[in-house]
Amino acid sequence: MKVTESYLPAITMRNTKPRKLFESFGLAFANWLCLFAVAMLLTLASTKASVVAEAVEDRPSFDLEYGKHIVDLNTVVYCRDGNKIETWTCPVCDKPRIKDFEVDDVIHEFELNIMAFTGYSPSLDAFVFVFRGTKSDDLRNWIIDLSVLELDLDLPYPGSNGAKVHGGFYRTYATTHVRVLVLESWARLRAKYGTDKKVIVTGHSLGGALATFCALDLKLQHNETDLQLYTLGSPRVGNDNFFTFFHNWIGDSIRVVNNYDIVPSLPPTFLGYHHIAREVWSVNTNKTQPDGLPVLNNIVCDDSGEDEHCSDGACLFGICSSIPDHMTYLNIYITCGQPQDNKKHNFESLESFQKK
C-alpha cells in the first residue's frame, strides 16, 4: 500500500491537457455565476414544490445500511493527510462500518488537486475506488466544475457516436495520472485478492463525475463484469446520447440526491445535459428520529435519469440551490471530522463547512 503523487498528464489526447481548463474560463465562469444567482433568487422567492413519488413495485429497493457504508467511505477521502488514510488512522477511519478497510493506494494529482483512494473492503467483499469531491477553498476544482464546454467522448468506447460529456470532468479523469494509477491499483487488487470480487466505484460531488468515467473505463477497457457505480450529489456529466451509451454498458448504477442539493441540478438540462440513472432521492420528512436526526424518505426513482417526480420536480425550473444539503448524505456529514458528531454540526454555508 502506498501514497502516490502525480504531477504530469499520463495520456496524450488532442486538445485535452489540464491547462486547457483555464482557457475560455471567463465566459464559463460568468455564465455559471449568473445561473447560480438566478437559482438562489428563484428558490428564495418561491416555496419548494411538494413532490411525492409513489412506490412502484418493479423498482429495486434501497438498502439504507449499505448506502451509509458507501457514505462513510466518502467521508474518508476528504481527510487532507494522505498518510493517515494510507494507515487507516484518519479521524473517521474507525467508523464501525468501515474500520476493516484495507487500503491499496492513496492518489493525489497535484496539478488539479484531485484525490482518490483505493482498496479492499472485507465487509463488502469488494474492491472500492473512492473519488473526492469539490473543495471550495481550491479554485482549481471550481474551475473544473464551472467549465461548461462539452467535448466528444474521446476514449475509444464502442457505440459512443453522439455521446458528449462535460469537458472539465472528462479531462480531469482521462488526461491525468489519476486514471493510470487507479487502473494500476485495480490490477494489484485482483492479483492480491482474486478476480471474483465486486468492484464499487464511488464519489461525492465532483468525485461522482470522475467515478462515472472510471466505472465506464473499468467496464469497457478492462472487461470488469461485476461493477457498481454509486454516487452522492453528482452533477450531470453528459448528454442524452451519453445517458443511452452509459446504460447500455452499466446496469448497476445508483445516484443518491439529498433533498434540495444544488449540485445535481447542474449543469442544467437546457444546456443539453441529461442525468444517468438510477436516482434515489433522499427527502427530509421534517420528522425527527429518537437520536435527533431527521427521518428520511429514500425514494427510488424511475430509470429515465430525469424523473419529474423526484429531485427534478422539487425546485422551480428544476434548479435547486441548497449548499447545506450538498454536505450531508443519509444523515452523515461528508467531512473528515469526529465520526459521531452528526447532530452537533449545523453547516449554514459551504464556507462554514470547510472550517470544520
Tell where the protein language model's regions lie, with residue ranges.
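Short N-terminal segments immediately surrounding and downstream of signal-peptide cleavage
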Residues: 52-72
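Lipolytic serine-hydrolase domain surface
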Residues: 239-354
